[in-house]
Amino acid sequence: MAFNFNWSPLMADASFYTRAQDLLTAALNKSPKPPIIVDDIIVTELNLGSIPPELEILEIGDLAEDRFRGIFKMSYSGDAFLTLKTRVQANPLNTYLLTRPSFATPRPLAAATPLTIPLQITLSDFKLSGFVILVFSKQKGITVVFRNDPLESLKVSSTFDSIPFVRDFLQKEIEAQLRILFMDELPAIIHRLSLRLWVPEYRAGEELQTQTASANGEGPGQDPLASPPQDPVDALGNALNESEIESLSLDSSVETHSLFSQKNLLRLAALTDSQRTLSLFTPSIREVVYRAWTSPSDQTDASGSVTSPFFPVLSRTQSQVGSMSSFPDSASMVSSQSRSSTPFHTFSGYGLSLGAGRHSKAHARKRKKRVVDLRRPKTTDDAPSVSDESSFTESTSAPSICSAPLPVLDEQTDDPVTPPLSPDNDLHLPAIPERHRMSISRPALRRENASEMIRDTAECKPSSNAVGQAIQEEDLSATPRAAVRAHGASVLEKGKQDPDSSAGSSRQLSSTILPFINDNPTGGVVDQALVERLAGEIARRMRDEKFMASNACGPFWDRHSQEESPPPAYGH
């Protein structure tokens, strides 16, 4: 079976080329164009050439006088060519600004000036190879479908062939567009041409649509501003009645074009306001309650939940190195006024967090007032007693390098364990069970030894030599090591000789004094009256605060008094 394809009539028919050019122009402008192309793509020349394609019949599904369906293998390497004409934007900055949002791009003055250049592109040397499904019917026309991408290569000649990177860019972009054209647009173009050629009804309907479109396009256009609107307003927004509109004439200063509809103005204003959200300068929102507070006073107004003392809470506390010190051997916070102005003390944020988050935020103000009362500066006559007591406590409870690798931590002056030189006040202080439960990593042996030694010292009132011997005996009983004595004993001796200078010298306890020295304790008698007066004052303040907070913290103190535990620091 043989078929004869007559290719010459297609080359000779001028109307066929005209119609094909129009269809190709519509197809090229229908798809989204790159932003560099600023004008329509017009097909100025189309020629199918004199070399027909080669067709190989693979399958014939239906064959009759008025219909045909089969599968072909097509190969084409002829002299057909296509010429396109358009305009492109030569300034890349102008193209970049047009494709980006206005609020996110700079505003150049002259650098973004558009520069359009006419461009002419000629496509030639087509090489096609693919499988084609062809369906022919006199009633339905010709349908051609490519099962694969038929375009192998082509040659692109343009105005910018002298610029290599522009030539390569155009070659790549046009090849991509032609692949879409062969797979989607070319079958539709061939189908419409076949309907126009073999179906008279389709031709008549198409001619009628063309006449209707040309008739609508003729004649002058209507000016929507020629007649006044239904609800006219002047340039200032004042409403106008019918008599004022009729009084206006063509010779008057107020023209009809200056009358605008109030409804349209409101719509334009609403549209403008809605577009303002795209700008970076969005107006602030009024009547909005902000849930995030930055100041501590705003935080106290909000109702907070009760925080467990076993989980530390981050709290905003004004603390500085050298002004606050804590004892982290238990879960509760033990803080006092610093005994040194130099940054030699260790600071524990964990203790501060536990102390700040023990109670609910409703009692935050009362807790803050109580802390302020306990941290009032001491008078000048109490300074020697405070320094003597502090140095004595540090010398009794400080560990050695061999037994405790932890740094030397300061005992607090407001701790009930430190000042109870009178036994009556020490035996009735309440116990806090959290300290007993949370002291897991470090034993409380040092705290008990210190309290027992201070209690024995208060009862017997020994001399400074007896105090030094008791310190060495207790230190040996706690841990098996050589009898050592810290620098606190020597500071204690200086406190007796110069009470004014002992307050500053005894407070300078740094971490560099960890190595203890072996020397014999020598010193004077501690001013016992001042120490007892200080201990009584602290105990009286704690009893007053306990009675003042009985309504809010009554169950807390009762629960602590029922449990048996060594007397630790106060509960807050």
Curated annotation (Swiss-Prot):
Q: Which PANTHER family match?
A: MITOCHONDRIAL DISTRIBUTION AND MORPHOLOGY PROTEIN 34 (PTHR28185:SF1)
Q: Which GO terms describe its biological process?
A: mitochondrial genome maintenance; mitochondrion organization; mitochondrion-endoplasmic reticulum membrane tethering; phospholipid transport
Q: Quote the function comment for this protein.
A: Component of the ERMES/MDM complex, which serves as a molecular tether to connect the endoplasmic reticulum (ER) and mitochondria. Components of this complex are involved in the control of mitochondrial shape and protein biogenesis, and function in nonvesicular lipid trafficking between the ER and mitochondria. Mdm34 is required for the interaction of the ER-resident membrane protein mmm1 and the outer mitochondrial membrane-resident beta-barrel protein mdm10.
Annotated region Disordered: where?
212-236, 355-426, 487-507, 552-572
Q: How does it sit in the membrane?
A: Multi-pass membrane protein
* Alphabetical UniProt keywords: Lipid transport, Lipid-binding, Membrane, Mitochondrion, Mitochondrion outer membrane, Transmembrane, Transmembrane beta strand, Transport
* Notes on the domains: Lacks alpha-helical transmembrane segments, suggesting that it resides in the membrane via beta-sheet conformations similar to those predicted for other outer membrane proteins and porin. The SMP-LTD domain is a barrel-like domain that can bind various types of glycerophospholipids in its interior and mediate their transfer between two adjacent bilayers.
Write out the biased-composition intervals (Basic residues). 358-370
List the cysteine pairs that form cystine: none
Name of the molecule in the record = Mitochondrial distribution and morphology protein 34
Q: Where is the composition biased (Polar residues)?
A: 387-400
Q: What binding partners and quaternary form does the record give?
A: Component of the ER-mitochondria encounter structure (ERMES) or MDM complex, composed of mmm1, mdm10, mdm12 and mdm34.
On the tree of life, the source organism's domain of life is Eukaryota
* GO (cellular component) term, any one: ERMES complex
Q: Where is the composition biased (Basic and acidic residues)?
A: 371-381
Protein species of origin: Aspergillus fumigatus (strain ATCC MYA-4609 / CBS 101355 / FGSC A1100 / Af293)
**Similarity comment text for this entry:** Belongs to the MDM34 family.
Tell me, in one coarse class, where this protein mainly resides.
mitochondrion
Q: Where in the cell is it found?
A: Mitochondrion outer membrane
User: What GO annotations for molecular function exist for this entry?
Assistant: lipid binding
The record places domain SMP-LTD at 1-195
